Amino acid sequence: MMAEKKKKELPRKVVADNRRARFDYDIGEVFEAGIALKGTEVKALRTGKATIHESYAGGKNGELWLFNSYVPEYLEANRFNHEPRRPRKLLMHKRQIHKLTVAVEREGMTVVPLKIYFNEQGRAKVEVALAKGRKAHDKREAVKERDWNRDKARLMRDRG
């Protein structure tokens, strides 16, 4: 009898986080998407120096693409390296892509990436969300509300 090999469970490692998106947008429905990468991009992502704070997703020919995301060049790749700001294809079901593109076209919403991470199987995933842009006064209101909730929690903790 052969012993079964146990697959090594990798923890979910967040590579890039778009914290600014939660401040600039009202986040709606969140989706998980795969991302089509080249080999050097995967290795560069594992170093953890990618940024997505200025990136967005958009539909093109029935496909969803991630634009303006920055994955630095992999130092050991020499001439076979990738372009750091190239558009990257997001892998989702057709129904999900259709839902996102309809929301963008009809309701004026935006598709923003929230984070890039490696799942338990070691595959790169992108968490994208439907979002509506906030005005300056909405941002101030959100900050006030967050501060009030923090003060309220502090008071409840001290009293109770």
From Swiss-Prot:
Protein name in UniProt: SsrA-binding protein
Pfam families linked to this entry: SmpB
Gene, per the UniProt record: smpB
GO molecular function, one term: RNA binding
Main localization, broad class: cytoplasm
One GO term (biological process): trans-translation
InterPro entries named among the record's database cross-references: SmpB, SsrA-bd_prot, SsrA-bd_prot_CS
Localization per record: Cytoplasm
Protein family per UniProt: Belongs to the SmpB family.
Region annotation (Disordered) ranges: 134-160
Organism: Azorhizobium caulinodans (strain ATCC 43989 / DSM 5975 / JCM 20966 / LMG 6465 / NBRC 14845 / NCIMB 13405 / ORS 571)
Entry keyword GTP-binding: no
Compositionally biased residues, Basic and acidic residues: 138-160
Keyword Membrane: no
Function: Required for rescue of stalled ribosomes mediated by trans-translation. Binds to transfer-messenger RNA (tmRNA), required for stable association of tmRNA with ribosomes. tmRNA and SmpB together mimic tRNA shape, replacing the anticodon stem-loop with SmpB. tmRNA is encoded by the ssrA gene; the 2 termini fold to resemble tRNA(Ala) and it encodes a 'tag peptide', a short internal open reading frame. During trans-translation Ala-aminoacylated tmRNA acts like a tRNA, entering the A-site of stalled ribosomes, displacing the stalled mRNA.
One GO cellular component, as annotated: cytosol
HAMAP family given in the database record: SmpB (MF_00023)
Keyword terms, alphabetized: Cytoplasm, RNA-binding
